């Protein structure tokens, strides 16, 4: 299912953090969401997954009402992903599989857990407590959790922040693999990451979309980003 957002606005207190956002994303696209801190990237993602509600623009015509069309099945990895660190990895995933799926059989629950563990490369860590894991492996747990419902849309907010170079490449490889089967939207501060993983880039600054182009049409992403964000 395609994603369509029309005339999305959002205020937090007196601050207008998203301003008339219009965005359409086709099936199977991997979209990199770029922007400075506070640009509105995380707010947009939280509205897409239903954590926050969007708003109509003030004083706009009837034909400019806010519209949000997204798949029902969405996996979300927030930037600050709270994990139950006292639980073992396998136990943790089994807990969330039980909450998020309609499968009645404990056997099918267990099989899904094992499939997720294998898919994200947690086999050797499955019997460790989540709190014992490195940040890279904790991100794998978060990705497995986001994939429980085999979502049509995967939304990842800063999925590689704070990872060392080896962990970074491992997580990028996982995201590339997951992007072969679904639409992915990821936010990042790393321009090279967008070049490597994304088919399209959307740059947001001060709550507005400044650039929305296929990555193949951008000759110099660094320069495009600087111009879009007035960053000298």
What would you call each of these model-derived segments?
Residues 168-180:
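Helical segment within the ABC ATPase nucleotide-binding domain
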Residues 49:
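Helix-to-loop junction immediately C-terminal to a conserved catalytic motif
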Residues 3-5, 18:
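Conserved structural motif at the start of ABC-family nucleotide-binding domains
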Residues 94, 98-101, 106-125:
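Conserved ABC ATPase "signature" region
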Residues 154-158:
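Catalytic Walker B motif of ABC-type/P-loop ATPase nucleotide-binding domains
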Residues 129-136:
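Conserved ABC ATPase signature
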